């Protein structure tokens, strides 16, 4: 009976925490407290493949828009691993439109030097110079990309982190340009949101974005634009993955 009672208390606490957070649109510190540029600033989200923006960065994109930042997106490949590049470009534009990013602020590199291939190591210096060009062209105040583990461990994701890290450590970023990296978490935290929630809220945070239920529906709608990628396991991903509703990020 004691075990049952403890389980009931645990479930009640988790449910309370879930409901407390779920429909709050302000689950992060002020931009100034977090070290972020304020309203009117320009953010550049740097991804490797079409669908990264919906699978991983939707909470950040919607959260930055909520903070009145102008969000642009730089995608390094067309996702042509299965010769679907042209289809995936169109899907990316549709997804970005759902997330509030117009086509004029979506840049797709799609060069042979940056193939969608986990077996190919992108050249860090080349990636870095390309990112820097777009930072200058867009007068960027904030760069957002993957962390050292790339969330899923994909080498193309990690290549982006290495490039941005090189720019940051080398002092090549424009003055006042900040960098946020998306925190990778273990499989249990990634797919069991109720268990992850208390850990996320109690852990030291750089920046935390938690979507409202309405925004989660928006993120799922963006993901549904990637029809060529919606295999059965990705449907499960949209239901269970924390990255459809929560992003925790760290400043470099």
Swiss-Prot record:
- Which Pfam families does the entry mention? PIG-L
Domain of life, source organism: Eukaryota
Record keywords = Endoplasmic reticulum, GPI-anchor biosynthesis, Hydrolase, Lipid metabolism, Membrane, Transmembrane, Transmembrane helix
Topological domains (Cytoplasmic): residue ranges?
Answer: 23-252
Q: What is its EC number?
A: 3.5.1.89
Where it sits in the cell: the answer is: Endoplasmic reticulum membrane
Q: Which GO terms describe its biological process?
A: GPI anchor biosynthetic process
Q: Which reaction does it catalyse?
A: a 6-(N-acetyl-alpha-D-glucosaminyl)-1-(1,2-diacyl-sn-glycero-3-phospho)-1D-myo-inositol + H2O = a 6-(alpha-D-glucosaminyl)-1-(1,2-diacyl-sn-glycero-3-phospho)-1D-myo-inositol + acetate
Cite the SUPFAM superfamilies for this sequence.
LmbE-like
GO molecular function: any one? N-acetylglucosaminylphosphatidylinositol deacetylase activity
**EC class (word):** hydrolase
- Taken from the UniProt record, the cysteine pairs bridged by disulfide bonds within this chain are none
Please give the chief subcellular localization of this protein. Answer: endoplasmic reticulum
Q: What family does the database annotate?
A: Belongs to the PIGL family.
Question: What function is annotated for this protein?
Answer: Catalyzes the second step of glycosylphosphatidylinositol (GPI) biosynthesis, which is the de-N-acetylation of N-acetylglucosaminyl-phosphatidylinositol.
Report the protein name in the record: N-acetylglucosaminyl-phosphatidylinositol de-N-acetylase
């Amino acid at each position: 009976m004691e075990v049952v009672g403890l389980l009931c208390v645990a479930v009640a606490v988790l449910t309370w925490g879930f409901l407390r957070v779920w429909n709050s649109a302000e689950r992060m510190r002020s931009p100034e407290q977090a070290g972020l540029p304020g309203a009117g600033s320009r953010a550049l989200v740097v991804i490797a493949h079409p669908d990264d923006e919906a699978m991983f960065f939707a909470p950040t994109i919607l959260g930055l828009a909520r903070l009145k930042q102008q969000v642009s997106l730089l995608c390094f490949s067309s996702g042509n691993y299965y010769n679907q590049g042209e289809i995936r470009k169109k899907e990316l534009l549709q997804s970005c439109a759902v997330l509030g990013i117009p086509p004029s602020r979506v840049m797709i590199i799609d060069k042979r030097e940056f193939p969608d291939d986990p077996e190919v190591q992108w050249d860090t210096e080349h990636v870095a110079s390309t990112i820097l060009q777009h930072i200058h062209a867009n007068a960027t105040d904030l760069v957002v990309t993957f962390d050292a583990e790339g969330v899923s461990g994909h080498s193309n994701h990690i290549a982006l982190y290495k490039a941005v890290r090189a720019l940051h450590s080398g002092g090549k970023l424009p003055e006042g340009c900040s960098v946020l990296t998306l925190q990778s978490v273990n499989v249990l935290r990634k797919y069991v949101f109720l268990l992850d929630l208390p850990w996320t809220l109690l852990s030291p945070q750089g920046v935390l974005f938690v979507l409202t239920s309405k925004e989660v529906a928006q993120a799922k709608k963006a993901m549904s634009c990637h029809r060529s990628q919606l295999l059965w396991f990705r449907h499960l991903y949209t239901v269970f993955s924390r990255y459809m509703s929560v992003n925790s990020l760290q400043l470099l």
